[in-house]
Amino acid sequence: MKTNKKELTVFALCAYAIPFLMMPLLYICLQNGRDTSIFANAQMFYPAAGVMLAFLLARRQGTPKRFYILHIAATALMLAMSVLSAFLPQEGWLNIANFVIIIASVLGWIFLLTEKKTKREDYGLCLHGKLLTALVICVYFLAVKTAMVFLSMAMQGGDSWAEYLAYWRTSAPWVMAVVLVPNFFLSFLPFFGEEYGWRYYLTPALQGRFGARRGALAVGVLWGLWHLPLNLFFYSPDTSLQSIAAQLVVCVTLGVFFTFAYEKCGKNIWLPVVLHYLNNSMVLVWTGTADISNQIISWTDVAISAIMYGVVFLPFLAA
């Protein structure tokens, strides 16, 4: 997949400029005690929207226009709601955003499944073979991530560890794990929104310039820094430096693994989309809550995360 400076510029403006331009609004929301979750949801749409807008403006031939326009329209709606949420009463904004995600995801499947196969193949949207390999990769990812969560809780010891084991003896995590399966099909678009930008577009662009390994690492760094507005005003406002460091650790190492998975399965974009979905959504299963805002992160947490993620995922850089 070849690109040029004009397309890269459009991508960068959508993927990076918009999130950073949202920082004053995030600050306003934080100062006024308003929920900033909708900004995080909207930001996931921007990378793919940048790719799609770049391709459409370049008048590339044979683009899947219906799907592209749908995603861009959904992105515009999410962006508009984010802006409005900073100034208008917040009741209902997140519910409306979730409704938009569901409707857009369902329409997305319809447009994709009724699109010509040649268009899907030309623009990296086909579900390729090697499904058994993809399944093995997903199982590995779930197993090691679950083990990492258990290890982190075990290191806390005492009542925290006992309570966590008791949580797994209830039906809650198992029911939530089952619910996540159909939920993927109703909410895939934000995760696709990131992976189509990072893995399908930016990774090969940087690998062509810097080589396969350095290109994958560079995307991981850029992906991590892309989260900076959320690190400052959503994930961990009180320990933002630690949050940024932890984000870089996670994005560089997971970026290596997601790129490995993408290329191992014949550049099948749907595998990193599923992996990204599992990484984000399984938090509900692992912890019993979907709230990832206002975290308190220590430098010890960052160091432990760097060791675990580095040991588990960085070796795939050599694969």
What residue spans do the PLM features occupy?
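Loop-to-helix transition at the N-terminal end of transmembrane alpha-helices
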Residues: 33-51
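Alpha-helical transmembrane segments
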Residues: 7-23, 46-47, 70-81, 105-106, ...
